[in-house]
Regions:
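Short, aromatic/His-centered strand-loop micro-motif at the edge of beta-sheets
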Residues: 187-232
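Sec-dependent signal peptide recognition
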Residues: 1-7
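Localized edge beta-strand/strand-to-loop motifs within extracellular or lumenal beta-rich domains
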Residues: 137, 227-243
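Beta-strand acidic-aromatic groove motif in beta-rich domains, primarily in extracellular
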Residues: 141-150, 241-243
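Short hydrophobic/aromatic patches on beta-strands that form ligand-binding or substrate-lining surfaces
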Residues: 34-37, 132-138, 231-233, 373, ...
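Glycan-recognition/cleft segments
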Residues: 146-205, 263-274
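Extracytoplasmic low-complexity segments
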Residues: 15-110, 159, 166-169, 255, ...
Length: 421
């Protein structure tokens, strides 16, 4: 690997050919909206810009900012100097997201809302699909990698007591480094920009089956070269499936006993409330004030698997319990004389996750969120993901497994940085 890097660095023509081939592998993938490789800039030393389709009007230059300074009025300004360069990466360069120790300093790279609203990057509304791919080395953390995901600063928390600008959540789509499953590829989407299932947070998210390991960001070059992972999320608006992918593989992930989960217990309750609302009359456990648009009831018409848990014949009546596995849920069903008398949620599928809505469409008043890389606007102001990011790509359709595997193959042999940026 090291020999390959040295050879390419010493022969400009070979480097240019390898770099061009890799960029074309991304830009020729149908549906590309923007691709930042951290090599392409406005000018040497200028802002990073995106590769975009021919004829596109926007190159989505990335600004540097500290969202704590912008919204709390605290902390120093951020600059490109706060994102050290590795000098190598899947496309020749990578930026470092550091574990900042100053709680008033949370730097990120971003495209302001004013420059992206109603452009192809502003993926939203009926029938719209999205894929986000991030080539990264994860040092620590489980939070945001890239996307339009302004979490809002209107939550009543200790961290927001000194907020200078109170703003509602403006979430659309984003890719995270795991969240509830640290190190996984976690796709996150929202239909309302705000919260889900009466919880204060957005909870429509998926997690790849596999998770990325932690790798020290200051590891030796050979170790870093072997540590690139390809995080991805897809939302297919036709199937309503949100899927997390790590290194081109999605895998199956379920959450058993979701009622006991700190956050997804709210999704379990949304399933219950939606089921009870369909039964005439007020049922035990039913909340008549639960908003109908927050019910969570994936299709449960035809099970993919049925396991009989118990069969009993008593007092002339046949009682049977079945575990029915549907595509997105597992449900324990009780039947008496073949008539359903009870239904209990046993598990929720986390990958893929069923999302029955359209992506949030912000108002055209400037309040929508920016597209950010490395962090998102976050009321708790946590450090989040740390490590190296060597590329970010956004597509306006759900890429397939073969396409994502091809994009991951680009990370297996990193390139050195070009001689002049």
């Amino acid at each position: 690997m090291k020999r390959l890097l040295l050879c390419l660095a010493g022969v400009p023509g070979l480097y240019a050919d390898a770099y061009t081939e890799r960029v074309q592998a991304v830009t020729s993938t149908p549906g590309l909206v923007a691709f930042w490789d951290f090599t392409k800039r406005e000018a040497p030393g200028g802002r990073f810009t995106a590769h975009v389709p021919p004829g596109a009007k926007h190159d989505y230059a990335l600004d540097a900012g500290n969202y704590v300074k912008d919204l709390w009025g605290q902390g120093p300004a951020a600059s490109y100097a706060d994102f050290p360069l590795l000098g190598a990466g899947p496309f020749g360069e990578a930026i470092r997201i550091k574990a900042e120790t100053n709680p008033d300093f949370r730097p990120l790279l971003f495209v302001p809302r004013a420059r992206l609203h109603d452009t192809p990057l502003d993926i939203k509304g009926a029938g719209q699909a999205v894929t986000v791919v991030v080539w990264a080395i994860r040092e620590s953390g489980n939070h945001a990698l890239a996307g339009i995901w302004h979490e809002g600063t209107d939550l009543k928390e200790k961290s927001t007591e000194t907020i200078a600008k109170v703003e509602r959540g403006q979430r659309q789509y984003a890719l995270f480094a795991g969240l509830n499953k640290e190190g996984a590829a976690c796709g996150h989407v929202s239909e309302n920009g705000a919260s889900s299932f009466l919880n204060k947070y957005a909870l429509h998210k998926c997690n790849s089956a596999e998770a990325s390991p932690k790798v020290p960001a200051d590891a030796d070059p050979a170790s870093l070269a072997k540590s690139w992972r390809t995080f991805a999320m897809t939302f297919d608006s036709r199937t309503r499936e949100l899927t997390g992918w790590l290194d081109g593989a999605s895998g199956d992930r379920w959450l058993e006993n979701p009622q006991k989960d700190r956050l997804l217990s709210f999704a379990a309750n949304a399933w219950l409330q939606g089921r009870l609302a369909k039964i005439p009359g007020l049922q035990e456990g039913e909340d008549p004030k639960f908003p109908a648009d927050q019910y969570y009831n994936p299709p449960e018409e035809t099970p993919v698997k049925v396991t009989v848990l118990e069969e009993v014949l008593a007092e002339g009546r046949a009682r049977r319990e079945e575990l029915r596995e549907y595509r997105y849920t597992k449900v324990k069903v009780t039947l008496v004389d073949d008539r359903e008398t009870g239904r209990e949620l046993v598990a929720l599928r986390l990958n893929p996750w069923w999302f029955p809505h359209d992506l949030y469409t912000p108002k055209a008043d400037g309040t929508g969120g920016p597209f950010t890389i490395g962090r998102v606007i976050h009321s708790s102001r946590g450090v989040g993901f740390t490590g190296w990011i060597g590329g970010v790509a956004v597509f306006n359709r759900a890429l397939g497994a073969a396409e994502l595997a091809q994009l991951h193959a680009l990370a297996t042999a990193p390139l050195p940085a070009p001689a002049a940026k």
